Amino acid sequence: HIVLFKLKDEVSAEEKLVVMNKFKEAIEALPAKIAVIRKVEVGLNMNPGETWNIALYSEFDTLEDVKYYATHPDHVAAGRILAETKESRACVDYEL
């Protein structure tokens, strides 16, 4: 499960950094709350010239686990952190 987020251009660099760090902290706390998460990493793009601001990488045993995670209230709450600043999102789910 790989997700990229782009924040709105009109959001200041300072506000982006605050929101990105809050999101990272919230997502990285999820494995303690959602047992189906095998691994999660959130990378913050420090290169302002690039399109995507946040990269989220996570591992699950099954696609059903991904679906469970996607609708879990703690995950939904973490996603709300980006609600006002997110411009776009790209997601890829694949099996190994």
Positions of PLM-derived features:
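Short, well-ordered beta-strand segments in beta-rich or mixed alpha/beta enzyme
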Residues: 1-7, 41-70
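N-terminal presequence-like segments and adjacent domain-start helices
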Residues: 9-17
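An amphipathic, aromatic/His-enriched active-site/gating alpha helix that lines ligand/cofactor pockets
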Residues: 17, 24-37, 59-92
